[in-house]
Amino acid sequence: MPMSEPIDWLPDGTPYSPRFGDRYHSELGGLDQARHVFLGGCGLPAAWADAPQWRILETGFGFGLNFLVAWEAWKADPRRPRLLHFVSAEAFPVSADAMRQAMPREPGLRLLAEELATRFQGLLPGVHRLAFEQGRVLLTLYIGDAQAMLRRQQITADSIYLDGFTPELNPDLWSADTLRALARHCRRGTQLSTWCVARTVRDGLAQHGFQVRKVDGVPPKRHNLHAVFDPAWQPRGPRAQPQEAITPRRCMVLGAGIAGAAAAASLSRRGWQVTVLDTADAPAAGASALPAGLFCPHVSPDDSLLSRLSRDGARLTLAQLQMLSGQGLLQPGTDWCDTGVLEHGVEAAPRLPRDWQSPGPGDHWSRPASADQLSAAGLPADAPACWHVQAGWVRPARLVQAQLALPGVRWQGRACVARLARTDTAGGAPVWQALDAQGNLLAEAELVVLALGPATNALLEHSLGAQAAWPLQPIRGQVSWDVHTPASAQAMPPFPVNGHGNLVPAMPLPGDAAGPGWVMGSTFERDQTALPPSPEDQAAAHAANGAKLAQLLPRAYQGLQGFFDAPPRATWGAVRVASPDRLPVVGPVSDQAPGLWALTAMGSRGLTLSLLCGELLAARLHDEPLPLDARLAAALASERLGRRR
């Protein structure tokens, strides 16, 4: 797809679409329409008063004016919902530069528009989640044909904005098939508003269950259209049995690694009081105690499921790191850095998707490495390599600590949960109780999230029986790390490199370490669970990491050869788990155990995928718009493991 939708500009500054032969809007008309036809036409902000969440679905994002007006109204409303979801389908996204050129002049809206434009990039076909207001205003963009995207995605809408170029110029957006697809996402009572009063649109809406009426329009139009989804028949399909609204109460998250902290953060933003329990004395004592790791997208010629999933994860991880830094919980440059990552294809050249055009939105994600980047890494000009733009390094323990410091999250260490039991309370509402080996109560809550990694199956078996175990494979990983000498520091590239293991070349070390450190790893020791590893295993892993580095970055290896020739001084080892298809596991544990969910099996991509999976878990729990394509979400669903037994 092209870099962005071409835009012409009329003498009065109005954006004009050469593709459709029509203007987007004038500034005054566009704002009036956004405020009165759409926001007011759907009864907002009054309709969302005191709601836990509100979900707006729009056709035709354009320059985002309807979103900006809804966001502005949400900020100004003391009775606003805890979360505002705005979901918009757009086949031809404009560029961030064009968005800036068309910014409204009102100061308040202009500030919001600049924040939107800053995030408005890398919009390849698919689903993109952009977060604002510390994750409480969530924009989900469906990039692609509106009809196809609406048929494929999962959302229950409270309000619908039916927008776009006129039916004469863009008939597909107003077709009966599109209106049918919209109706599939309605609950009874969903309000719809549009400026279009064409007879075909009125009849199409009525045919698909909407009660339609004309209302006074915004000049120069005499009328607008208002509709309420209230079919005379009982709907079938997804809207027939809407998910029962869940009230945030108490939640126990078992496991204080990256996955557990991600679940705690996502649920606390939705009003849950979360207690995170772990056997260790401090958070991030397991696999998340890694000195530093990478978040980075994966690339493949066919743009595989993993490639698309990892882009969604990298975008959300970077956004969360920025958000936590804005709250003063992380320090950029010390706890994390979006350096970009060079991927050197030692065993096979990294291949970008075949259908990516350059220039194009894919350039915001990954592109061929430049001569300067290869030179900086000490690699030859013809080395097979690509550059990942939205990527960098993180100190996992600091990320975990930051998420556990969010309001509504409480840490409880030295909590050795041996069994979970579901019991009724005096008030009649069942709760889960976490019990130690002696049967003592450690904590109780209405919801439990298992983020235990290799300890998941033991707890499932002790709590639900042997048949509850999942087919998870333990994989031990070991890295080598140390403090730089002046000579080794000079041999390092200025950015991380992956492709055959990965090297974080320079990062601040905690405590009293004298200078920056480096990290190289990791090994993949399947079915190995012994911790700490034996001295012999540590030495073998140290040698393996050195051998990988020698192939990945010969110059960097020469600078660190003294470290690798000597016995390991600083190593780290932990056990991760992977599912049979090497994808994370997100969702309910069993129909027979209501309120028991899991977030696990991040494998070697915990920093890239855990935060996305935390948002997916919360979205599934609360019947929210999903933060990724529904097909990707289905691939991560815990229900798939039951089918493998």
From Swiss-Prot:
Record's catalysed reaction(s): 5-aminomethyl-2-thiouridine(34) in tRNA + S-adenosyl-L-methionine = 5-methylaminomethyl-2-thiouridine(34) in tRNA + S-adenosyl-L-homocysteine + H(+)
Gene Ontology terms: biological process: methylation; tRNA wobble base modification
EC id: 2.1.1.61, 1.5.-.-
Transmembrane segments: none
Compartment(s) of residence: Cytoplasm
Keyword annotations: Cytoplasm, FAD, Flavoprotein, Methyltransferase, Multifunctional enzyme, Oxidoreductase, S-adenosyl-L-methionine, Transferase, tRNA processing
Stretch list, region tRNA (mnm(5)s(2)U34)-methyltransferase: 1-230
SUPFAM superfamilies from the UniProt entry: FAD/NAD(P)-binding domain
Location of region: FAD-dependent cmnm(5)s(2)U34 oxidoreductase: 254-645
GO CC annotation: cytoplasm
Major localisation: cytoplasm
Required cofactor names: FAD
MF annotations from Gene Ontology: flavin adenine dinucleotide binding; oxidoreductase activity, acting on the CH-NH group of donors; tRNA (5-methylaminomethyl-2-thiouridylate)(34)-methyltransferase activity
Stated family: In the N-terminal section; belongs to the methyltransferase superfamily. tRNA (mnm(5)s(2)U34)-methyltransferase family.
Role of this protein: Catalyzes the last two steps in the biosynthesis of 5-methylaminomethyl-2-thiouridine (mnm(5)s(2)U) at the wobble position (U34) in tRNA. Catalyzes the FAD-dependent demodification of cmnm(5)s(2)U34 to nm(5)s(2)U34, followed by the transfer of a methyl group from S-adenosyl-L-methionine to nm(5)s(2)U34, to form mnm(5)s(2)U34.
Family annotation (HAMAP family): MnmC (MF_01102)
Name of this protein: tRNA 5-methylaminomethyl-2-thiouridine biosynthesis bifunctional protein MnmC
Taxonomic lineage: Bacteria, Pseudomonadati, Pseudomonadota, Betaproteobacteria, Burkholderiales
Gene name in the database record: mnmC
